[in-house]
From Swiss-Prot:
Listed PANTHER family: 60 KDA HEAT SHOCK PROTEIN, MITOCHONDRIAL (PTHR45633)
Protein name: Chaperonin GroEL 1
Subunit structure as annotated in this protein's UniProt entry: Forms a cylinder of 14 subunits composed of two heptameric rings stacked back-to-back. Interacts with the co-chaperonin GroES.
Catalytic activity: ATP + H2O + a folded polypeptide = ADP + phosphate + an unfolded polypeptide
Enzyme class: isomerase
Species assigned in the record: Prochlorococcus marinus (strain MIT 9312)
Keyword vocabulary terms for this entry: ATP-binding, Chaperone, Cytoplasm, Isomerase, Nucleotide-binding
Function: Together with its co-chaperonin GroES, plays an essential role in assisting protein folding. The GroEL-GroES system forms a nano-cage that allows encapsulation of the non-native substrate proteins and provides a physical environment optimized to promote and accelerate protein folding.
InterPro entries: Chaperonin_Cpn60_CS, Cpn60/GroEL, Cpn60/GroEL/TCP-1, GroEL-like_apical_dom_sf, GROEL-like_equatorial_sf, TCP-1-like_intermed_sf
SUPFAM superfamilies: GroEL apical domain-like (SSF52029), GroEL equatorial domain-like (SSF48592), GroEL-intermediate domain like (SSF54849)
Pfam family, one: Cpn60_TCP1
GO molecular-function term, one example from the UniProt record: ATP-dependent protein folding chaperone
Length: 584
């Protein structure tokens, strides 16, 4: 495809247009008086959101070079969302201001590389000051942080606080849709571990990039799976039952993984696979814990068990399993509660008998995972649109609260950034030329979140910032008053602010030091098929054999079915089989 090139100030100006296009749409979503953004969906009702990352991802700009700028600032929002779970709008606002100020100075003759250095020096100073101002989160502050992150919604703050209190920081909190109008909290058995799906093709929710399995059957083994030949009988039973299926194994690779993906994508089997957590003996112990939680039998060669011996009775089950790219959460049924309790007691006895402090710590980690349980926040609403909106708000609030527990909190409403901005003045005055200008770019950007919070609440941002400096108090956008925000419970998680600053400086500096932008030249739309007087639909090509389920079953090589080598059967349209080597 032919490319178009843009150079120097021309490229930077086009990139800035893209940045402004996205940032102006995103920044209305910050603060307690934030506004909503309505997003059209091709199918179903439109989404109403107040989340910077979601808004940024939806925006495409016709000009290819400007669209590159839009994608860069989208990267800021998505990276902050991924790392902190919140703070995407703050990061976007900071980036926009740094880009605007930086480009003004470059147009006046400043060196982009020196500006970048100055911005990095300023960032290091800001992060040091931010850390020094951070305070640990006390139990009573959890609800305050959750409420602020939920846009001042007291109900959401209360539910998250209760959930945190019950399952503690070692437990798991998940958010799901409720069939009722009320938002409720339910505590059940479950756990999570740090392993994600083996392939992104297992994802069931493309927007959130998660795989969700409702009432799945679960195979747990400490063996490596590279072929599905031994599992064909059990896979056939699973397919007939219509149950989702999770394979948790030491590893699943090669032909086995490819075959599962193809069968998943062709609708033959709702399946996913996850590598077992940890390593060595600790891995086996973790698999035993998960087996007890789910009522499964651990298929292990140590117990003289092989995969071809697996029956439906050896499989575990769960209410729901949610898998992201790096984490798996299991919500278990209550009927394993006594088994889990007995397992925890056994592990506690092991701790008492173990002299190694390291081993004691690791066993205690297992106890915490098993005993912590899972808190289910069931989101109720009158309409599907409201349901999606509330669910997003709760997820953001939950992420912010977890971040606050990790690294503490600072005064909210942008007050801490304003204080640090004033302290940057001394550093700036000690620097020279473009380095000083780079520091000042960061200094000015630190004021922007508060200005936008004030603007969204109907106040003049410049006036509000001036009053904050004069009174040495923060601005409560809910009441329109200047207060001690820590006493008022208006707190921001330090981690969220830190990551927003780091990500915004990183992307802004990259954009300011860009000299050439390269993008595809859009191709003209193709003429309608069929030609004058012809069928506008064209003709339908012949279809290959569909290989529908039941044609030969899921048997061994030579038989129709799951798509093993040499097999015909349940292939995708136009294919005799699943597309594996040697398939008919």
């Amino acid at each position: 495809m032919a490319k178009q090139l843009s150079f120097s100030n021309e490229s930077r100006d086009a990139l800035e247009k893209g940045v402004n296009f996205v940032a102006n749409a995103v920044k209305v979503t910050i603060g307690p008086k934030a506004k909503n953004v309505v997003i059209e969906r091709k199918f179903g009702s439109p989404d109403v959101v107040r989340d910077g990352s979601t808004v940024a991802k939806e925006i495409e700009i016709e000009n290819p070079i400007s669209n590159l700028g839009a994608k860069l600032i989208e990267q800021v929002a998505s990276k902050t969302k991924e790392s902190a779970g919140d703070g995407t709008t703050t990061a976007t606002i900071l980036t926009q201001k740094m880009v605007q100020e930086g480009l003004k100075n470059i147009a006046s003759g400043a060196s982009p590389m020196e500006l970048k250095k100055g911005m990095e020096v300023g960032l290091a100073f800001v992060l040091e000051k931010l850390s020094s101002k951070s305070i640990s989160l006390s139990g009573s502050d959890i609800q305050k942080v959750a409420t602020v992150s939920a846009g001042g919604d007291q109900e959401i703050g209360s539910i998250i606080s209760k959930a945190m209190d019950i399952v503690t920081s070692d437990g798991v909190i998940t958010v799901e849709e409720s069939q009722s109008l009320d938002t409720e909290l339910d505590i059940t058995e479950g756990m999570s571990f740090d392993r994600g799906y083996s392939s992104p093709y297992f994802v069931t929710d493309q927007e959130r990039q998660v795989c969700e399995l409702e009432n799945p059957k679960i195979l747990i083994t400490d063996q490596k799976i590279s072929t599905l030949a031994n599992l064909v009988p059990i896979l056939e039973e699973i397919q007939k039952s219509g149950s989702p299926f999770l394979i948790l194994a030491e590893d699943i690779e090669g032909e086995a993984l490819t075959t599962l993906v193809l069968n998943k994508n062709s609708g033959v089997l709702n399946v996913a696979s996850v590598r077992a957590p940890l390593f060595g003996e600790r891995r086996k112990a973790a698999l035993e814990d998960i087996a007890i939680l789910t009522g499964a039998k651990l298929i292990s060669e140590d117990k003289s068990m092989t995969l071809d011996q697996v029956s439906i009775n050896d499989l575990g089950k769960a209410k729901k399993i949610t898998i992201t790219k790096d984490k798996t959460t299991i919500v278990a049924f209550e009927d394993t509660k006594d088994l889990v309790k007995a397992r925890v007691e056994k592990l506690k006895r092991e701790v008492e008998m173990t002299e190694s402090e390291y081993d004691q710590d690791k066993i205690n980690e297992r106890i915490a995972k098993l005993a912590g349980g899972v808190a289910l926040i069931k989101v109720g609403a009158a309409t599907e649109t409201e349901m999606k909106y509330k669910k997003l708000r709760i997820e953001d609030s939950l992420n912010a609260t977890k971040a606050a527990i990790e690294e503490g909190v600072v005064s909210g409403g942008g007050q801490t950034l304003i204080e640090i901005s004033d302290e940057l003045l001394n550093l700036s005055q000690k620097s020279s030329d473009d380095l000083r200008t780079g520091i000042n770019i960061v200094k000015e950007a630190l004021l922007e979140p508060t200005k936008q919070i004030a603007k969204n609440a109907g106040f003049n941002g410049d006036v509000v910032v001036a009053e904050i400096k004069r009174l040495n108090k923060g601005f409560n956008a809910n009441s329109g008053k200047y207060e001690n925000l820590k006493e008022s419970g208006i707190l921001d998680p330090t981690k969220v602010i830190r990551l927003a600053l780091q990500d915004s400086v990183s992307i802004a500096a990259m954009l300011l030091t860009t000299e050439v932008a390269i993008a595809d030249i859009p191709e003209p739309e193709a003429a309608a098929p069929g030609g004058p007087g012809g069928d506008p639909m064209g003709g339908m090509g012949g279809m290959g054999g569909m290989g529908m389920p039941g044609m030969g079953g899921m048997g061994m090589p030579g038989m129709g079915g799951m798509g093993m080598p040499g097999m015909g059967g349940m292939g995708m349209p136009g294919m005799g089989g699943m597309g594996m080597p040697g398939m008919m």
